[in-house]
Swiss-Prot record:
One of its GO terms (cellular component) is cytoplasm. It comes from Brevibacillus brevis (strain 47 / JCM 6285 / NBRC 100599). Modulates transcription in response to changes in cellular NADH/NAD(+) redox state. This is Redox-sensing transcriptional repressor Rex. NAD(+) binds at residues 91-96. Residues 17-56 bind DNA. One of its GO terms (biological process) is negative regulation of DNA-templated transcription. Belongs to the transcriptional regulatory Rex family. Homodimer. It is found in: Cytoplasm. One of its GO terms (molecular function) is DNA-binding transcription factor activity. Keywords: Cytoplasm, DNA-binding, NAD, Repressor, Transcription, Transcription regulation. Pfam families: CoA_binding, Put_DNA-bind_N. PANTHER family: REDOX-SENSING TRANSCRIPTIONAL REPRESSOR REX, REDOX-SENSING TRANSCRIPTIONAL REPRESSOR REX 1.
Amino acid sequence: MAKHEKISEAVVRRLPIYLRYLSYLQQVEVTTVSSQQMGKNLDVNPAQIRKDLAAFGDFGKKGIGYDVDYLVEKIREILKLTDEIRVALVGAGHLGHAISNYNAYLKDNMRIAAIFDNNPEKQGKKVAGIPIQPLSELEETIVNKQIKLAIITVPAPAAQSVCDQLTQAGIKGILNFAPTTIRAGKDVRIHYADVTSNLQSLAYYLT
């Protein structure tokens, strides 16, 4: 974890935003881009962009900017997206279905490789071509498929128990959609995607 702690989480969270924009530039055949152009389109201070990228190396040329293809390649390497990353999803409800189907649509190298649910009526059925398995098969499947990331979309009361099972199986990163706080060891990174809380904070700005 030491090498990761040198880079702030805020920087790491901005890298995928840069990557998404740069990937768009590739699609429209733009070959170079300046930090000013990136900042204007992403609403991020250009100096912050330069500082973020400089934390990982010297990727730009003064007066020219960044080579789009090269920067995409480097950011993907930094985020460890050059190889296939397998993800487990726990909770095959409406949200779990939506995430699985969207992931299949993306056709990216980060793919959902296993889906689990404790409802016997769902087990054996497929979502985006992936069979839903019982939670009793979670640890064995995660180990066998070498899955390191997981998504939790279960109800709040079940989230911590699921988190415990995932970390016991060797999961190193969890994206939690359950509207509750979960805890794991220091070697497990947890991110939250609480739609309700985000909407509530937006409501504050209503006039």
